[in-house]
């Protein structure tokens, strides 16, 4: 078999079109010994709503989920960025502007660095 595997948490559909991320899955996935990524942009999408629909995501949860994944010391992060998110042709409701992405990524890496320093102390 292929040993070059990357696991990705993207949320699981429960209830009313919500994709739910259980942070415990980060630890479970890491236990398999493969790199783990978090698809933050997908995890806030509203399941079953077209990606062009502005009601198709819950962007207000993106910062919290991104920071949780940084604290979990994952190997990578997916986010979707667009110069004009509301006019993006796909996943408009979950896109970050360049400015939003820059601010959140800066915070993300500060948390990730702190967590790694704690692990190594």
What are these regions (language model features)?
Residues 1-81:
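Catalytic alpha/beta core domains of metabolic enzymes, predominantly
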Residues 84-117:
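C-terminal helical cap(s) of enzyme catalytic domains, especially alpha/beta-barrels
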